[in-house]
Amino acid sequence: MATHDSKQLEILQYIYDTVENRGFPPTVREICAAVGLSSTSTVHGHLTRLERKGYLIKDATKPRALEITHAGLDALGIKPKDIPVIGVVTAGQPILAVQDVEDYFPLPPNLASDAGELFMLRVHGTSMINAGILNGDYVIVRKQTTAQNGEIVVAMTDDGEATVKRFFKEDLHYRLQPENDAMDPIILNHVQILGKVVGLYRTNID
């Protein structure tokens, strides 16, 4: 049994290393070659057992969708990174940004390869509902000061207030566009980008 456990941990470690190095998990054949197994069915068996142990999540609809859970990281002796939750950001009527860390949130394994500095902000309002960002959601943000047109960003307005909007640089101004047909864009001569939204966490599902 110990041999099976060690082989499973070897497979888990290889999946982790591959995602860290290239950003996506290996194929079953790559796992075979890496851990010295000749049968893909044997690897599938190990992956199923890792899933039963709660170390791995597989998506049956995607051939290479393997995600290591926090329990899996613990089994490998890897401490998950934590994302600081910083104040509240408004999607709708902006409010003053609060640059205080309120809490820490475990880094989702699918963002483990993100090289940037991440933080989270809680969204209040409905201005981004067409983009699937709802009131009370937490946006995961990569800290950066630039953005491409059409990207969803956290931006600071001229009044020193933070808001989540879709970013557009136009000829004479910047446009922070809501994803809600009932709301108007914010037009600014100057804008400070705090970061790009790279993920979303929802605590309540209605």
From Swiss-Prot:
Catalytic activity reported: Hydrolysis of Ala-|-Gly bond in repressor LexA
Keyword annotations of the record: Autocatalytic cleavage, DNA damage, DNA repair, DNA replication, DNA-binding, Hydrolase, Repressor, SOS response, Transcription, Transcription regulation
EC number: 3.4.21.88
Active site: S127, K165
Domain of life: Bacteria
Enzyme category, top tier: hydrolase
GO biological process, one term: negative regulation of DNA-templated transcription
Chain segments annotated as coiled-coil in the UniProt record: none
Function recorded in the entry: Represses a number of genes involved in the response to DNA damage (SOS response), including recA and lexA. In the presence of single-stranded DNA, RecA interacts with LexA causing an autocatalytic cleavage which disrupts the DNA-binding part of LexA, leading to derepression of the SOS regulon and eventually DNA repair.
Oligomer status and interactors: Homodimer.
Name the record gives this protein: LexA repressor
Taxonomic source organism: Lactobacillus delbrueckii subsp. bulgaricus (strain ATCC 11842 / DSM 20081 / BCRC 10696 / JCM 1002 / NBRC 13953 / NCIMB 11778 / NCTC 12712 / WDCM 00102 / Lb 14)
Gene name, Swiss-Prot/TrEMBL: lexA
